[in-house]
Amino acid sequence: MDSRIPYDDYPVVFLPAYENPPAWIPPHERVYHPDYNNELTQFLPRIVTLKKPPGAQLGFNIRGGKASQLGIFISKVIPDSDAHRAGLQEGDQVLAVNDVDFQDIEHSKAVEILKTAREISMRVRFFPYNYHRQKERTVH
């Protein structure tokens, strides 16, 4: 009796799309080139604090939520708004707002929390990879 698994019974594995490596740059020039930047502090979580006067806008939009399984992300920041000056940027993942965990929250609940708060303390991190994955899911 042959104990090998039939070929059709093997699991199917989908690999991510191939990304071409950056163009070759001489080692002495790499320290100044963004494709060879090893500075990772931009991806660390940070706290952004905003105060919203009654009736005022926050200065940013969000997308995503529990249904997307990728989290809540900043999708737009209005130039010269308080949010822009505080350092929010498109692609920031909202981890928490006023100590409420935003990593597994419904979009409508996230909007409600952001709209009703007057003082907002947000823990965010720049996470463009998941942000772009989320955008791709909602475009199709």
Swiss-Prot record:
Gene Ontology terms describing biological process: neurotransmitter secretion; pore complex assembly; regulation of synaptic assembly at neuromuscular junction; synaptic vesicle transport
Keywords tagged on the record: Cell junction, Cell membrane, Cytoplasm, Membrane
Highest taxon listed in the record's lineage: Eukaryota
Compartments it resides in: Cytoplasm; Cell junction, Adherens junction; Cell membrane
Main localization category: cytoplasm
Pfam family name, one: PDZ
Endpoints of the signal sequence: none
GO cellular component: adherens junction; basolateral plasma membrane; cell-cell junction; cytosol; pore complex; presynapse
Domain PDZ: 47-129
Molecular function GO terms recorded: protein-macromolecule adaptor activity
Functional summary from the UniProt entry: Mediates docking of ADAM10 to zonula adherens by interacting with PLEKHA7 which is required for PLEKHA7 to interact with the ADAM10-binding protein TSPAN33.
Subunit: Interacts with ATP2B1, ATP2B2, ATP2B3, ATP2B4 and ATP7A. Interacts with PLEKHA7 (via WW domains) at zonula adherens; this interaction is essential for the interaction between PLEKHA7 and the ADAM10-binding protein TSPAN33. Interacts with SLC5A6.
Protein name per Swiss-Prot or TrEMBL: PDZ domain-containing protein 11
Species, as recorded: Bos taurus
Top-level taxonomy: Eukaryota, Metazoa, Chordata, Craniata, Vertebrata
